[in-house]
Each structure stands twice: as C-alpha cells, then as structure tokens.
C-alpha cells in the first residue's frame, strides 16, 4: 500500500520538526495516547502546575532532567497503565513518551530513570505535599465554573496492601491490611478534587475538620460567591467539623450513627409505621421525621433527620400471620440545611456517591436551603 492514509487530526510539531505517523518499522511505541495527553497538558497545565509546586534542591549545573519533564513522564506513565516507577527504565527510551515530554524520539536524551523518579517522589515533606494538593485545588477551582450552590462529597475507599507498606493497618471490616484513601468529589461535574492516602482507620474529628477547612478556604479564593455544602457518611459527621462549618458559614449533611436516645425520639413514629405497614399490602413502607437533638459531646443542638423503613424479614422471633417478622430500619442524618425530611434524605443525602445522577441547578436552590 503506497497511498498515504490521512489522519483525522493533526499532530503538533516538536522542536520545529514535523510529526508524521506510519508503521514502516524502526523504534515503535504502543503508547500513542500520550500525544493526546500532551495536548491536554498544553491546555490545562496540570503537570506544569505540580512541577512549580515541587521543591528542587538540586545543583543547577548538574541537572539533566527538568522538574516538569520528570513530573510529566511520571504522570504519562501512570496514565498509560505503568504504575510502578521501575517501568520508567524501559519507557525512558519510548519514542512517543519522549515526544510527549518535548524531546526528539531518536536524537533526544532518554527520560529520567527509575532511580531518579523514586528520589523525586520521596522529596516532598508533609508541607510540600499539602502544597501539591493546593496546586490541584487551584487547577480545579479555575477550571470548573461554579454555580450558586456546589456540593462536595467526602468519602474513603479501602485499598488492600500486599506487603509491609507504611501506614497499612488492619481493617476488621475488610479482614485485611490496607489503606483508606480519603476522596473528595465535586458532585455537579463528578470531578475528583482531592485524594489523600491515609491509614485504614476511622478519621478523627480534627483530621476531618482540617481537610474540610483547607479545601473550603482554597476553593473560596476562586468561588467567592458560591455556597458550599459538604456531604459524607457518619465517619465525617464529627463535632469538630460541624462546629467549624457552622462558625464559617459552610453547610453540611452527614450521616449520624444511631443510639438509644435517637431511637427513643422516633419510637412513636416507628410504632405508627408498623401499624400502617401491617394494614398495607406493600412489602416496604417508609416514613421520615426531623427533630432537634444535642449529643453529650456537642456544644449546641442540631437538626437531625430520620428515615424509617418497615419491611418483613424471615428471621426467627415474633412473627406475623404470614410467618414473617416486621423490622424497622432507621437511618439518621445531621444537617445544617433547611427542607423537608424526605427531601433531605432522598434527594440530597442518599444521592451521595452517585455524581452522575445528582444535579443542583439554580431552580433547586430553594429546596436545599
């Protein structure tokens, strides 16, 4: 075949050299997607922003790999599925990787090796790691156009560890050692905002407050007129975080672990639900309640919303005429938001973690008030 096949898009030149693609042999690469990622970097500048936040304590006269080139190579390798730094020993000679970083595929010097990349990843201190997170927050804040109200989801994901990695703790729920990375997502766009690698343990109140405080303050420099709402499960409904949010004008809706006091406050509602469920032909029946509650560790009362669901369960014990037992499942939510109990539970809290199905257009601002 001698006819040229036209490409559906133009590839940009590198160092004033025209870039063409063929399969005639020579030094080939299977990482063609890095050229598209290079264009994304040109548009958004994520790697450059990270490189500027990284400390560079090297002797300027002995530098062979610029900070941006090392960060770019590491990010591109991860994006192509090469998570381990040792993969760079092979990828440093890859022609397309070199092109994407800005070096000529044949005559250009190889990229940074595994040992150089490993030293790079161990350079940042905790303060400098926080500076990198702030750089990503700035990237997000300048990229996403905010509305009048924005919801941020905060949650953790368990990641099993195979070996003796630092901070890999035993987790009884998952029955293995690992990490519990903290993730923050922007609900309207589904964009990840922050990811924090941490030990597999329930976060303390001071830890939750610190994260929420720093993320909120950083985003407010870009979203000065936007109302921010934090949403998370009971791990994040800590008194330290709620008090800071209330004092700083930030809204929240968090899960709340049940206890005997809360159950007593909705006991009458639960009895009425059992009565109506017994007379109903439905397999499940729900109702909602809201009330003011103050736990012993709280310095002020707060609004609590309860969702009660009655259903028939085939467990042993007191049974109905059908051989099934009535059971009422109760879930609690603590919030600073106004609105009906049903709306806050179903339309706001229960949409947690489902970014694709959650939208908060302007006309819904009155509901989440």
Name each model-derived stretch.
Residues 155, 227-237:
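Acidic/histidine-rich, metal-coordinating catalytic segments
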Residues 149-151, 227-229, 251-253:
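Structural preference for beta-strand elements that scaffold enzyme active sites
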Residues 174-177, 213, 247-262:
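Acidic, His- and aromatic-enriched active-site or binding-groove loops in soluble protein domains
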Residues 166-170, 244-250, 267-272:
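Short secondary-structure boundary/capping segments
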């Amino acid at each position: 075949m001698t006819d040229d096949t036209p490409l559906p898009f133009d590839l940009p030149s590198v160092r004033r050299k025209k870039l063409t693609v063929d399969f005639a042999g020579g030094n080939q690469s299977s990482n063609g997607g890095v050229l598209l990622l290079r264009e994304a970097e040109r548009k958004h500048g994520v790697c450059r922003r990270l490189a500027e936040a990284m400390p560079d304590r090297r002797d300027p006269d002995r530098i062979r790999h610029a900070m941006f080139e090392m960060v770019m190579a590491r990010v591109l390798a991860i994006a192509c599925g090469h998570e381990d730094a040792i993969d760079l020993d092979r990828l440093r000679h890859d022609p397309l990787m070199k092109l994407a970083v800005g070096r000529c595929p044949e005559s250009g010097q190889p990229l940074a090796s595994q040992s150089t990349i490993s030293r790079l990843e161990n350079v940042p201190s905790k303060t400098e790691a926080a500076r990198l997170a702030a750089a990503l927050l700035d990237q997000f804040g300048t990229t996403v156009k905010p509305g009048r109200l924005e919801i941020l989801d905060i949650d953790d994901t368990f990641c099993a560890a195979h070996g003796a990695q630092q901070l890999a703790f035993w987790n009884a729920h998952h029955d293995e050692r690992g990490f519990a990375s903290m993730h923050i997502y922007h609900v309207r766009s589904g964009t990840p905002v922050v990811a924090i690698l941490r030990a597999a343990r329930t976060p303390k109140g001071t830890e939750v407050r610190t994260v929420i405080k720093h993320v909120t303050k950083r985003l407010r420099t870009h979203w000065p007129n936007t109302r921010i709402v934090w949403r998370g499960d009971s791990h994040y409904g800590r008194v330290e975080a709620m008090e800071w949010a209330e004092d700083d004008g930030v809204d929240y809706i968090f899960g709340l672990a049940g206890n005997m006091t809360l159950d007593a406050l909705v006991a009458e509602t639960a009895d009425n639900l059992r009565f109506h469920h017994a007379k109903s032909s439905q397999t499940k029946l729900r109702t909602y309640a809201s009330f003011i509650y103050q736990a012993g560790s709280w310095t002020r009362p707060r609004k609590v919303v309860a969702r009660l669901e009655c259903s028939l369960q085939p467990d042993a014990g007191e049974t109905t005429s059908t051989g099934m037992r009535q059971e009422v499942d109760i879930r609690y939510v603590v919030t600073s938001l106004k609105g009906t109990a049903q709306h806050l539970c179903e339309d706001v809290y229960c949409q947690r973690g489902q970014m694709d199905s959650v939208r908060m257009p302007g006309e819904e601002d009155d509901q989440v008030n």
